[in-house]
């Protein structure tokens, strides 16, 4: 019974009808373990596993912060002063913090959050702790607002005071946005990584090499898929297409194998029939070679392989996809700290910009919804070629 109540308490963060200890105990008596598993599956699938994970993490942080900062649990609905306190504790002027320890998040609050593992340990003085990333603060405020709506409440997150405080705090914090991957994995870099998947002269590529090659090629060629999309890819999402010409304007050009991937729900898109991307050429060959070598005919496409080379039934995790990229970078003599799986996504758009592919064309493959976000990669790629920077020679 206690385990069922605990599971329902976890669900209460996202399903308001389950909120409250009395309600949880009542439902624990009525619901079977299978019923609770079904509810958890609906909650996870209905909003996406990553979104659910982020919301749960944000809820835990907000609860922990409020308890430490005010001595009380989160109130529902949240008053404006509490939201303003949250902003002040997470976005501040780093220079003023150096001279005034009471500026920004108080030291005792930071230490308590570190002790609860809700905040990273600061190796140096707490005065040197940087403010939070504005995007993180904005996401947590959005999660807080979402939790209000799911409880049938209206939070004051759109109040003029909150919007003004957030806008000014972001300006004062002056923390530049950093890329998820310091360096983009462009086509040249990708070729270097692929060479590490060729195996040695004696044995050739092993099963791990074949898998990693397919992960890298599919991750890049499909528009720079997110690591969660690669780890969640299922055989049923693949459709093998007729061979297509290398040059679509020349029907007599070389014919290449093709396949389409139905992406389903992604971070920015709901599942729909047109949410598909096309793969052509050696990427399709690499994907087929992996499926043939692994004898995978259904379920997860990319799966774990143990240290003895045995294929597992479980899918790769998003973290495993990231580890594959870093491992191949290390084998290629590159610094793994400079790269992550997101480098495949940024690298795809950067490469498209370098080849003067229209941004709208690239976005159809990458499935970016924001022109501004996609344009940032095009701007970075074109910076070194700008004529305006060469006016004085």
Predicted features along the sequence, with ranges:
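N-terminal core-binding DNA-recognition domain of tyrosine recombinases/integrases
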Residues: 37-52, 59-179, 199-204
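C-terminal secondary-structure termini that scaffold catalytic or DNA-interacting sites
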Residues: 1-19, 392-393
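Short, charged phosphate-coordinating catalytic segments
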Residues: 219-257, 360-364
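Basic, alpha-helical nucleic-acid-contacting "clamp/cap" segments
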Residues: 247-311, 319-328
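Basic, Lys/Arg- and aromatic-enriched nucleic-acid-binding interface segment
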Residues: 191-227
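Catalytic-site neighborhood detector that most strongly recognizes the C-terminal catalytic loop/helix
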Residues: 366-391
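Flexible interdomain linker/hinge and immediately adjacent N-terminus
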Residues: 156-197, 265-267, 306-312
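C-terminal catalytic core of tyrosine-transesterase DNA break-rejoin enzymes
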Residues: 217, 344-369, 385
């Amino acid at each position: 019974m206690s385990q069922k109540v605990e599971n329902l308490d976890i669900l209460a963060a996202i399903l308001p009808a389950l909120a409250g200890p009395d309600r949880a105990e009542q439902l624990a008596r009525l619901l079977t373990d299978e019923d609770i598993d079904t509810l958890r599956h609906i909650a996870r699938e209905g909003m996406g596993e990553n979104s659910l994970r982020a919301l749960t993490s944000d809820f835990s942080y907000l609860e922990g912060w409020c308890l430490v900062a005010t001595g009380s649990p989160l109130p529902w609905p949240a008053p404006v002063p509490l939201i303003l306190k949250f902003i002040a504790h997470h976005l501040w002027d780093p220079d003023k913090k150096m001279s005034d320890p009471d500026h920004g998040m108080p030291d005792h609050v930071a230490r308590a959050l570190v002790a609860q593992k809700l905040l990273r340990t600061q190796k140096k003085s707490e005065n040197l702790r940087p403010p939070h990333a504005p995007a993180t603060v904005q996401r947590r405020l959005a999660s807080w607002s979402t939790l209000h709506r799911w409880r049938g409440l209206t939070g004051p997150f759109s109040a003029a005071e909150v919007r003004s405080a957030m806008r000014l705090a972001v300006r004062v914090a002056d923390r530049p946005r950093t890329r998820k991957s310091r360096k983009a994995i462009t086509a040249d870099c990708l070729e270097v990584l692929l060479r590490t998947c060729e195996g040695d002269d004696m044995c050739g590529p092993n099963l791990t090499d074949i898998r990693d090659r397919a992960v890298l090629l599919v991750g890049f060629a499909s528009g720079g898929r997110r690591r969660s999309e690669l780890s969640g890819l299922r055989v049923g999402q693949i459709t093998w297409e007729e061979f297509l010409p290398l040059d679509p304007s020349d029907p007599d050009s070389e014919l290449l194998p093709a396949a389409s991937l139905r992406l389903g729900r992604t971070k920015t898109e709901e599942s729909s029939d047109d949410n598909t991307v096309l793969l052509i050429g050696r990427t399709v060959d690499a994907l087929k070679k992996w499926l043939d070598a692994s004898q995978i005919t259904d379920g997860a496409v990319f799966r774990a392989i143990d240290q003895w080379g045995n294929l597992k039934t479980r899918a790769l995790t998003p973290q495993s996809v990231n580890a594959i990229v870093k491992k191949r970078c290390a084998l290629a003599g590159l610094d793994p700290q400079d790269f992550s799986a997101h480098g495949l996504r940024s690298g795809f758009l950067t490469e498209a910009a370098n080849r003067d592919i229209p941004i709208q064309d690239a976005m159809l493959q990458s499935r970016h919804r924001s022109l501004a976000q996609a344009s940032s990669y095009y701007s970075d790629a074109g910076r070194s070629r700008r004529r305006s920077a060469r006016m004085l020679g």
